[in-house]
Amino acid sequence: MKTGITINGKPVEVPSSFDELTFGQFLRLKESETDAETMCVLTSIELEVCKNIAPELMNVIIAPASDLGEVVYLNKPTVLGKDVPDNLGKMEYARKVNCDNLSRNYKDEEMVCRMVAIYMAEGIDDEDIEATYSLILNESFTNVVSAGKLISEQLKKMAESEAKIPAPQYESAELQAGIKNFSKYGVWGVVRGIALRHGCKMEDVYSWSYNTVLLELKYSAEENSFQRRLNRIMNKPK
Protein backbone atom coordinates (compact mmCIF):
# COMPACT_ATOMS: atom_id res chain seq x y z
CA MET A 1 0.00 0.00 0.00
CA LYS A 2 2.93 2.39 0.53
CA THR A 3 3.66 4.72 -2.39
CA GLY A 4 6.94 6.19 -1.14
CA ILE A 5 5.29 9.62 -1.15
CA THR A 6 4.74 11.82 1.87
CA ILE A 7 2.26 14.67 2.18
CA ASN A 8 2.42 17.04 5.13
CA GLY A 9 5.01 14.74 6.67
CA LYS A 10 2.80 11.65 6.51
CA PRO A 11 3.40 8.63 4.24
CA VAL A 12 0.71 8.12 1.61
CA GLU A 13 -0.74 4.63 1.39
CA VAL A 14 -3.07 3.48 -1.39
CA PRO A 15 -4.90 0.12 -1.70
CA SER A 16 -3.44 -1.99 -4.50
CA SER A 17 -5.82 -4.97 -4.21
CA PHE A 18 -9.38 -5.67 -3.14
CA ASP A 19 -7.99 -7.18 0.06
CA GLU A 20 -6.60 -3.78 1.02
CA LEU A 21 -9.72 -1.87 0.00
CA THR A 22 -12.51 -1.42 2.53
CA PHE A 23 -16.12 -1.85 1.49
CA GLY A 24 -16.82 1.76 2.36
CA GLN A 25 -13.99 2.93 0.11
CA PHE A 26 -15.39 0.85 -2.74
CA LEU A 27 -18.83 2.46 -2.45
CA ARG A 28 -17.33 5.95 -2.30
CA LEU A 29 -15.06 5.25 -5.29
CA LYS A 30 -18.15 4.49 -7.37
CA GLU A 31 -19.40 7.99 -6.60
CA SER A 32 -16.08 9.78 -7.16
CA GLU A 33 -16.11 12.06 -10.19
CA THR A 34 -12.64 13.66 -10.05
CA ASP A 35 -9.09 12.47 -9.40
CA ALA A 36 -9.06 14.57 -6.24
CA GLU A 37 -12.15 12.80 -4.92
CA THR A 38 -10.62 9.44 -5.82
CA MET A 39 -7.41 10.31 -3.99
CA CYS A 40 -9.40 11.49 -0.98
CA VAL A 41 -11.22 8.16 -0.80
CA LEU A 42 -8.09 6.05 -1.28
CA THR A 43 -5.78 7.93 1.08
CA SER A 44 -8.17 9.50 3.63
CA ILE A 45 -6.41 12.80 2.98
CA GLU A 46 -8.73 15.80 3.16
CA LEU A 47 -10.36 16.68 -0.15
CA GLU A 48 -9.11 20.28 -0.11
CA VAL A 49 -5.54 19.04 0.21
CA CYS A 50 -6.07 16.56 -2.62
CA LYS A 51 -7.37 19.32 -4.89
CA ASN A 52 -4.04 21.13 -4.59
CA ILE A 53 -1.87 18.13 -5.50
CA ALA A 54 0.02 18.48 -8.78
CA PRO A 55 -1.54 16.31 -11.55
CA GLU A 56 1.65 14.31 -12.15
CA LEU A 57 1.93 13.48 -8.44
CA MET A 58 -1.78 12.71 -8.29
CA ASN A 59 -1.38 10.16 -11.07
CA VAL A 60 1.40 8.39 -9.18
CA ILE A 61 -0.69 8.25 -6.02
CA ILE A 62 -3.90 6.86 -7.51
CA ALA A 63 -2.22 4.59 -10.09
CA PRO A 64 -2.07 1.48 -7.81
CA ALA A 65 -5.86 1.57 -7.44
CA SER A 66 -6.47 1.65 -11.19
CA ASP A 67 -5.94 -2.10 -11.42
CA LEU A 68 -6.98 -3.93 -8.27
CA GLY A 69 -7.10 -7.26 -10.08
CA GLU A 70 -9.93 -9.72 -9.68
CA VAL A 71 -11.87 -10.44 -6.52
CA VAL A 72 -10.81 -13.79 -5.10
CA TYR A 73 -13.76 -15.14 -3.12
CA LEU A 74 -12.88 -16.68 0.23
CA ASN A 75 -14.31 -20.01 1.34
CA LYS A 76 -14.38 -18.96 4.99
CA PRO A 77 -14.56 -15.17 5.18
CA THR A 78 -14.78 -13.38 8.49
CA VAL A 79 -16.70 -10.18 9.11
CA LEU A 80 -16.21 -8.16 12.28
CA GLY A 81 -14.05 -11.00 13.56
CA LYS A 82 -16.82 -13.58 13.19
CA ASP A 83 -17.46 -16.44 10.80
CA VAL A 84 -20.39 -16.16 8.42
CA PRO A 85 -23.38 -18.24 9.65
CA ASP A 86 -23.57 -21.53 7.76
CA ASN A 87 -27.21 -22.27 8.61
CA LEU A 88 -29.40 -19.22 8.12
CA GLY A 89 -32.47 -21.36 8.65
CA LYS A 90 -31.72 -21.50 12.37
CA MET A 91 -31.71 -17.71 12.61
CA GLU A 92 -34.69 -15.41 13.06
CA TYR A 93 -37.33 -15.27 10.35
CA ALA A 94 -37.16 -11.47 10.46
CA ARG A 95 -33.68 -11.59 8.93
CA LYS A 96 -34.97 -13.41 5.85
CA VAL A 97 -37.86 -10.96 5.55
CA ASN A 98 -35.48 -8.00 5.78
CA CYS A 99 -33.26 -9.46 3.06
CA ASP A 100 -36.24 -10.04 0.78
CA ASN A 101 -37.15 -6.35 1.14
CA LEU A 102 -33.70 -4.98 0.31
CA SER A 103 -34.26 -4.82 -3.44
CA ARG A 104 -36.92 -2.15 -2.90
CA ASN A 105 -34.37 0.44 -1.80
CA TYR A 106 -30.89 -0.85 -2.64
CA LYS A 107 -28.99 -2.50 -5.46
CA ASP A 108 -25.66 -4.02 -6.39
CA GLU A 109 -22.85 -3.89 -3.83
CA GLU A 110 -24.72 -1.80 -1.26
CA MET A 111 -27.49 -4.38 -1.17
CA VAL A 112 -24.85 -7.09 -0.62
CA CYS A 113 -23.34 -5.17 2.28
CA ARG A 114 -26.72 -4.63 3.93
CA MET A 115 -27.58 -8.29 3.47
CA VAL A 116 -24.38 -9.22 5.28
CA ALA A 117 -25.19 -6.70 8.02
CA ILE A 118 -28.63 -8.26 8.53
CA TYR A 119 -27.15 -11.68 9.22
CA MET A 120 -24.07 -10.50 11.13
CA ALA A 121 -25.96 -8.17 13.48
CA GLU A 122 -26.46 -9.31 17.05
CA GLY A 123 -30.16 -8.47 16.98
CA ILE A 124 -32.96 -8.04 14.45
CA ASP A 125 -33.93 -4.44 15.24
CA ASP A 126 -33.25 -1.76 12.64
CA GLU A 127 -30.85 -0.04 15.04
CA ASP A 128 -28.74 -3.20 15.38
CA ILE A 129 -28.62 -3.68 11.62
CA GLU A 130 -27.67 -0.07 10.88
CA ALA A 131 -24.94 -0.10 13.52
CA THR A 132 -23.53 -3.31 12.06
CA TYR A 133 -23.72 -1.91 8.53
CA SER A 134 -21.66 1.11 9.59
CA LEU A 135 -18.99 -1.17 11.05
CA ILE A 136 -18.92 -3.45 8.00
CA LEU A 137 -18.06 -0.47 5.78
CA ASN A 138 -14.61 -0.59 7.37
CA GLU A 139 -14.15 -4.30 6.63
CA SER A 140 -12.15 -5.73 3.73
CA PHE A 141 -14.07 -5.62 0.45
CA THR A 142 -13.01 -9.20 -0.27
CA ASN A 143 -14.34 -10.48 3.05
CA VAL A 144 -17.67 -8.70 2.69
CA VAL A 145 -18.43 -9.81 -0.88
CA SER A 146 -17.32 -13.35 -0.01
CA ALA A 147 -19.71 -13.31 2.95
CA GLY A 148 -22.41 -11.96 0.67
CA LYS A 149 -21.84 -14.79 -1.79
CA LEU A 150 -22.21 -17.44 0.92
CA ILE A 151 -25.34 -15.81 2.30
CA SER A 152 -26.86 -15.40 -1.17
CA GLU A 153 -26.34 -19.08 -1.92
CA GLN A 154 -28.18 -20.03 1.27
CA LEU A 155 -30.99 -17.56 0.59
CA LYS A 156 -31.45 -19.06 -2.85
CA LYS A 157 -31.91 -22.53 -1.34
CA MET A 158 -34.37 -21.13 1.19
CA ALA A 159 -36.39 -19.52 -1.60
CA GLU A 160 -36.42 -22.84 -3.46
CA SER A 161 -37.83 -24.55 -0.36
CA GLU A 162 -40.60 -21.96 -0.15
CA ALA A 163 -41.40 -22.39 -3.84
CA LYS A 164 -42.02 -26.12 -3.29
CA ILE A 165 -44.92 -25.43 -0.92
CA PRO A 166 -48.07 -26.15 -2.98
CA ALA A 167 -50.46 -23.28 -3.52
CA PRO A 168 -54.07 -23.76 -2.32
CA GLN A 169 -56.49 -25.18 -4.88
CA TYR A 170 -59.36 -22.74 -4.52
CA GLU A 171 -62.94 -23.53 -5.45
CA SER A 172 -64.57 -21.45 -8.17
CA ALA A 173 -66.85 -19.79 -5.62
CA GLU A 174 -63.83 -18.69 -3.58
CA LEU A 175 -62.16 -17.27 -6.67
CA GLN A 176 -65.31 -15.39 -7.60
CA ALA A 177 -65.48 -13.97 -4.10
CA GLY A 178 -61.93 -12.62 -4.49
CA ILE A 179 -59.96 -14.83 -2.11
CA LYS A 180 -56.75 -14.16 -4.05
CA ASN A 181 -56.96 -10.51 -3.06
CA PHE A 182 -55.54 -11.51 0.30
CA SER A 183 -52.19 -12.26 -1.37
CA LYS A 184 -51.47 -8.52 -1.48
CA TYR A 185 -50.74 -8.64 2.25
CA GLY A 186 -47.71 -10.85 1.62
CA VAL A 187 -45.50 -11.64 4.60
CA TRP A 188 -47.67 -9.57 6.94
CA GLY A 189 -50.64 -11.82 6.16
CA VAL A 190 -48.56 -14.97 6.63
CA VAL A 191 -47.22 -13.83 9.99
CA ARG A 192 -50.66 -12.68 11.14
CA GLY A 193 -52.11 -16.11 10.31
CA ILE A 194 -49.41 -17.95 12.25
CA ALA A 195 -49.80 -15.60 15.22
CA LEU A 196 -53.56 -16.19 15.31
CA ARG A 197 -53.05 -19.94 15.13
CA HIS A 198 -50.71 -19.91 18.12
CA GLY A 199 -52.32 -17.09 20.08
CA CYS A 200 -49.16 -15.00 20.15
CA LYS A 201 -48.02 -11.59 18.93
CA MET A 202 -46.82 -11.07 15.39
CA GLU A 203 -43.51 -9.82 16.81
CA ASP A 204 -43.03 -13.24 18.38
CA VAL A 205 -43.35 -14.97 15.01
CA TYR A 206 -40.71 -12.73 13.47
CA SER A 207 -38.31 -13.86 16.20
CA TRP A 208 -38.91 -17.55 15.47
CA SER A 209 -36.32 -19.35 13.38
CA TYR A 210 -36.85 -19.39 9.63
CA ASN A 211 -37.01 -23.20 9.74
CA THR A 212 -39.88 -23.07 12.23
CA VAL A 213 -41.87 -20.64 10.10
CA LEU A 214 -41.20 -22.73 6.99
CA LEU A 215 -42.51 -25.81 8.80
CA GLU A 216 -45.62 -23.84 9.76
CA LEU A 217 -46.19 -22.91 6.12
CA LYS A 218 -45.75 -26.51 4.98
CA TYR A 219 -48.10 -27.80 7.67
CA SER A 220 -50.69 -25.14 6.89
CA ALA A 221 -50.57 -25.99 3.18
CA GLU A 222 -51.03 -29.72 3.83
CA GLU A 223 -53.80 -29.10 6.35
CA ASN A 224 -55.57 -26.79 3.94
CA SER A 225 -55.32 -29.36 1.17
CA PHE A 226 -56.63 -32.10 3.48
CA GLN A 227 -59.61 -30.03 4.61
CA ARG A 228 -60.56 -29.25 1.02
CA ARG A 229 -60.35 -32.91 -0.01
CA LEU A 230 -62.37 -33.92 3.04
CA ASN A 231 -65.04 -31.31 2.32
CA ARG A 232 -65.36 -32.54 -1.26
CA ILE A 233 -65.75 -36.13 -0.04
CA MET A 234 -68.25 -35.22 2.68
CA ASN A 235 -70.28 -33.05 0.31
CA LYS A 236 -70.18 -35.48 -2.58
CA PRO A 237 -73.67 -35.91 -4.05
CA LYS A 238 -75.24 -39.23 -3.11
Model feature map: region roles:
Residues 1-238:
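An amphipathic, hydrophobic-aromatic interaction surface with interspersed Lys/Arg
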